[in-house]
Amino acid sequence: MSGDPTITDPTTWARDREIVLVRVLDATRDAVFAAWTDSDAFCQWFGPDGFSCTVREMDVRPGGRACFDMVSRDGTVYTNRFDYLEVVPAERLVLDHGSDTDDDPARFRVTIALDEQHDGTTMLTLRQLHPTVEQRDTKIGFGAVELGLQTLQKLAHHLKTA
């Protein structure tokens, strides 16, 4: 190993390359997990305000992938791909997220943990690990935290109305 940080080497996980979002959701872990893994449910909430979503493929299993488009108000299409690494129903998803191209240098690791709370709610912790500090800082600079929080707000609304 070269010692250079990568998203594939867990020994290089570093907080300076990480974005963490947390949201307590008024839903069971099963319902939250289904919102992430059912293609119809996923597109009802995924993406920041003003974006729509279309799933082209969703195969949620280790080694599977989801390919989907996020479309902005002005019609700009952003292709996306999740490559699933770990799937533990109602508990955890680990995936690599990037554009729907092979060898995307901006691809980052996402870990979604679902923790049931004593009151029946679910705490969702979403951790993004970016390949470099610079890439993380660039994402923060264009609003990744705010847009991510908008997305989790849409998830909360979806779960209340589902």
For each predicted feature, which ranges?
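Hydrophobic ligand-binding cavity/cleft-lining segments
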Residues: 1-52
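Short beta-edge strand/loop motif at the mouth of beta-sheet-based domains
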Residues: 20-21, 40-77
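A short, structured loop/turn motif at beta-sheet edges
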Residues: 29-30, 60-61, 85-92, 113-123
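Hydrophobic pocket/interface hotspot
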Residues: 32, 42, 66-68, 84, ...
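Short, highly charged C-terminal tails/helix-capping segments
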Residues: 158-162
